[in-house]
Amino acid sequence: MKLKIVAVVVTGLLAANVAHAAEVYNKDGNKLDLYGKVTALRYFTDDKRDDGDKTYARLGFKGETQINDQMIGFGHWEYDFKGYNDEANGSRGKNL
């Protein structure tokens, strides 16, 4: 019985962090990729600053374009959505 519980816990921990990526467009030297990640976190501690839900999701785009034979232009945008914010605070994130 205890072995089954350990197997369920290990499986749950491995599934708590999921990331995916997909190529949206790739033609004539122009490429656009979409990627994302979801991480489910919960900290149990006596420190009030670190205790609680720290779940977040990340969404991003990467792009490339062939300018000429020797030069490639690229761009990158990424945003973090915090799952533990209440509605009054809104979502906080970062752009890179």
From Swiss-Prot:
* Pfam families linked to this entry: Porin_1
A biological process from GO: monoatomic ion transmembrane transport
Q: Which gene encodes it?
A: yddL
The entry's protein name is Protein YddL
Q: Which species is the source of this protein? A: Escherichia coli (strain K12)
Q: Which residues form the signal peptide?
A: 1-21
Which regions span the lipid bilayer?
none
Anything further noted? May be missing up to 300 C-terminal residues compared to other porins.
Q: Name one GO cellular component term.
A: cell outer membrane
Specify the domain of life of the species encoding this protein: Bacteria
Q: Which InterPro entries match?
A: Gram-neg_bact_OMP (IPR050298), Porin_dom_sf (IPR023614), Porin_gammaproteobac (IPR001897), Porin_Gram-ve (IPR001702)
Q: Name one GO molecular function term.
A: porin activity
Disulfide bonding pattern of the chain: none
UniProt KW keywords: Signal
What SUPFAM superfamilies does the entry give? Porins
Tell whether Hydrolase is among the UniProt keywords.
Answer: no
Q: Which PANTHER family match?
A: OUTER MEMBRANE PORIN F-RELATED, PROTEIN YDDL-RELATED
